[in-house]
Amino acid sequence: MKTASTIMTTKVVTVTPETSVAEIASLLLEHKISAVPVIDDEQRVVGIVSEGDLLGRPPCGSPRGWWLRLFDESAACLEEIATARHLKARDVMTSPAVTVGEETPIDILATLMRRRRVKRVPILLDGRLVGIISRADVLDALARYGQEAASR
């Protein structure tokens, strides 16, 4: 069975604990990703900020995601939106993040993701971020593994 290092994305978009939620929202949209690991100065993962972390905080009872309102100056509740602009990654991140080492077998990773109900997992080497794996990456790897096994 393949390991995390064989399927991980190595060019990971990251933020620091001091990154603003507005900047995080922009990064998610710009890179078409659903989460960013939060790292310290030594590339150690201290948390993760996902779309769910951002969307889970609607101001004024609005059904619209509050972070989308950061881009809409005409929206109601400007005071709350102004407050939201001052939030940082450290204020909204999930911490600690679920992480694994790069030698973790993919089947173990899939089980962990299911049990912990996470959609992506930062991959570490010597405690430092070296990649990230999404559920789609795991499904693709398991499907390819199944096809390879069937063709033997």
List the predicted regions and their residue ranges.
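Structured functional modules or segments
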Residues: 118-119
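Bateman/CBS regulatory modules and CBS-like beta-alpha motifs in cytosolic regions of diverse proteins
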Residues: 1-33, 38-41, 45-46, 68-112, ...
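A short, polar/charged loop-to-alpha-helix boundary motif
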Residues: 55-71, 139-152
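Short hydrophobic beta-strand motif reused across regulatory alpha/beta modules
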Residues: 47-50, 124, 132-139
